[in-house]
């Protein structure tokens, strides 16, 4: 595999970007601050499982835009759908057929979505589910799990996980103390802690926000019985269970994590994959709850771009690809091969790691403990990950520049890509 140590055009673009874009990036996670700094790689184009940067280097991509690009870059079925929709106009400001078609397709895949509403992002979707839960229950408090990131609305930037934690600031300036008092945090996979919180505050809690499978301090699965107990305890106190499936929906199975785990929340927030690479969010749930949303009810939510034809067309096309036979079985097969190859490389070179993997998503932690909560992820060696990230990048393997993030496989990755990646891991571990 060729080396990619020289990236003069990326360095030049980063210098220019810092003069006109805050921090030189349009999302903090895109900077390399958490991995030792320097200019991020500027990409020219994506094709299948690969990126090509502005200096002509090719990378095997496991970032997948932090999850949405599950079918690989520039899949022709999706780009054709976007092109066809765009020819008829980019934005109407009126209802149209595609939003109905897509809503039906989501409902067929995720039965808990008795009614659906589209938004422009996962952040908007989560933000609105909380508003609706408050309207439905008449309560104000929200419970979330430490380290789980639910977007950048003020309320959710409390113990917020991968985004702020990557930069070493677990909360955000500008979030008021009054807002912070509306959120109660508790460790993921610790049901007794949650039980105690609800015993004390339950009559004031509107909802609990849950990643059914965590994706924002790495891939962390719930302990047996954890989600079932959350449902039971929450409903005993008259509060609602909201699943944030912005990362998990259509990642591990056709549908959502709730189908995989055989459990049902009251409401669900969606994003990322369902847009096929375009901006999107959606939320839905029980009909009696969703009827509190305007124009039927008092909980207001709107969006000029919400349900736009291009995003609807891209989402439908993406799901058409994912519902084909064997997609998730192949994710699991390649994911298992990648996991085993990394573990064998670590053993060969005496590097201490653990891996959490589910199907085609995994996280490599530089620690000797099994990570089941945010504190475990936090204890993983940041400096070691930063060195590993740079060594992989220099060999043409693109990972997320944060120890908290996952590696995502796409339908475009091949066995050859996995073999090349394992070879790069061996060379990187030999230098750690």
From Swiss-Prot:
SUPFAM superfamilies: PLP-dependent transferases (SSF53383). It comes from the Bacteria. Pathway: Porphyrin-containing compound metabolism; protoporphyrin-IX biosynthesis; 5-aminolevulinate from L-glutamyl-tRNA(Glu): step 2/2. It catalyses: (S)-4-amino-5-oxopentanoate = 5-aminolevulinate. Belongs to the class-III pyridoxal-phosphate-dependent aminotransferase family. HemL subfamily. InterPro entries: 4pyrrol_synth_GluAld_NH2Trfase (IPR004639), Aminotrans_3 (IPR005814), PyrdxlP-dep_Trfase (IPR015424), PyrdxlP-dep_Trfase_major (IPR015421), PyrdxlP-dep_Trfase_small (IPR015422). One of its GO terms (biological process) is protoporphyrinogen IX biosynthetic process. Homodimer. GO terms for molecular function: glutamate-1-semialdehyde 2,1-aminomutase activity; pyridoxal phosphate binding; transaminase activity. Gene3D superfamilies: Aspartate Aminotransferase, domain 1 (3.90.1150.10), Type I PLP-dependent aspartate aminotransferase-like (Major domain) (3.40.640.10). Its main location: cytoplasm. The modification N6-(pyridoxal phosphate)lysine is found at residue 272. Its cofactor is pyridoxal 5'-phosphate. It holds the Pfam family Aminotran_3. GO terms for cellular component: cytoplasm. Its EC number is 5.4.3.8. It is found in: Cytoplasm. Disulfide bonds: none annotated. This is Glutamate-1-semialdehyde 2,1-aminomutase 1. Keywords: Cytoplasm, Isomerase, Porphyrin biosynthesis, Pyridoxal phosphate.
């Amino acid at each position: 595999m060729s080396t990619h140590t020289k990236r003069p055009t990326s360095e030049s673009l980063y210098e220019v970007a810092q003069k006109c874009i805050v921090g030189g990036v349009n999302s903090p996670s895109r900077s390399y601050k958490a991995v030792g700094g320097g200019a991020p790689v500027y990409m020219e184009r994506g094709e299948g499982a690969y990126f090509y940067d502005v200096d002509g280097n090719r990378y095997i991509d496991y970032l997948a835009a932090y999850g949405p690009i599950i079918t690989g870059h520039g899949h022709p079925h999706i780009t054709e759908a976007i092109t066809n929709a765009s020819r008829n106009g980019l934005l109407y400001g009126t209802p149209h057929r595609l939003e109905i078609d897509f809503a039906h397709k989501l409902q067929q895949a995720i039965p808990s979505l008795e009614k659906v509403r589209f938004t422009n992002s996962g952040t908007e979707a989560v933000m609105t589910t909380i508003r609706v839960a408050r309207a439905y229950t008449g309560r104000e408090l929200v419970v979330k799990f430490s380290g789980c990131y639910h977007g950048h609305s003020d309320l959710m930037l409390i113990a917020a996980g991968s985004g702020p934690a990557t930069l070493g600031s677990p909360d955000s300036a500008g979030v008021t103390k009054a807002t912070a008092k509306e959120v109660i945090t508790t460790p993921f996979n610790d049901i007794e802690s949650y039980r105690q919180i609800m015993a004390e505050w339950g009559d004031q809690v509107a909802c609990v926000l849950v990643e059914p499978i965590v994706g924002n301090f790495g891939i962390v699965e719930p302990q047996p019985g954890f989600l079932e107990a959350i449902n039971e305890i929450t409903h005993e106190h008259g509060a609602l269970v909201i699943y944030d499936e912005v990362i998990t929906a259509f990642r591990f199975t056709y549908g959502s994590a709730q189908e995989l785990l055989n459990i049902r929340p009251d409401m669900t927030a969606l994003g990322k994959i369902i847009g096929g690479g375009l901006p999107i969010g959606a939320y839905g749930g029980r009909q009696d709850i969703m009827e509190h949303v305007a124009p039927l009810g008092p909980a207001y939510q709107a969006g000029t771009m919400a349900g736009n034809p291009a995003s609807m067309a891209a989402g439908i096309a993406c799901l058409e690809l994912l519902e084909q036979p064997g997609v998730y079985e192949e994710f699991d097969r390649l994911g298992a091969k990648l996991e085993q190859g990394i573990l064998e490389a670590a053993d060969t070179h005496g590097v201490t790691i653990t891996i959490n993997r589910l199907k085609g998503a995994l996280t490599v932690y530089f620690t000797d403990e099994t990570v089941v909560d945010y504190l475990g992820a936090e204890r993983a060696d940041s400096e070691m990950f930063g060195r590993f990230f740079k060594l992989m990048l220099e060999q043409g393997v693109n990972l997320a520049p944060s120890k908290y993030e996952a590696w995502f496989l796409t339908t475009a990755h091949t066995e050859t890509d996995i073999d090349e990646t394992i070879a790069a891991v061996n060379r990187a571990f030999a230098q750690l």
